[in-house]
Amino acid sequence: MQTLTKFKVSGKQTLAYTKQERINVGDIEGHILSLIEAKGVNVSTGKIEYMNGGQVVNLVTSDLVNFSGPIQGYSIVKKKEDSAIGKLEGKIITELSSEGTPVAVIEANLTWIKGTGQFKNIQGVVTAKGRYISENIYIVEWEGEYWIEK
């Protein structure tokens, strides 16, 4: 039986909203459903390079109360002929800082589900943590491992 080679990778992404739809649910104050598209760039930070300079598109839905709650969606990274698509699930937690301003942090897990080019048949997992640096811009640091199914 052949053993799969696993690659440990990590990176940092800076993303900005390019589309956003928010709908007030109306049951309790501050309850919204949200759909965003965010675009940005991936910077590889690990020993093994992964999609350094790749273009990132995140498509995320959320069910938030006072900007805290579950998120899910997809993250797509492309660089030339290579791409990797991951399904993500996680949460946004928004709290007030000591200065009284909202601080939103993101925690998510991603499972790679599809790839092209050198990432065709990609499988693997990622953990990610991020923070908003403005209302519509966020930074995510991630690490994980992948392998290519034969």
Segments predicted by a language model, with ranges:
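Beta-strand-enriched cores of mature, soluble protein domains
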Residues: 1-150
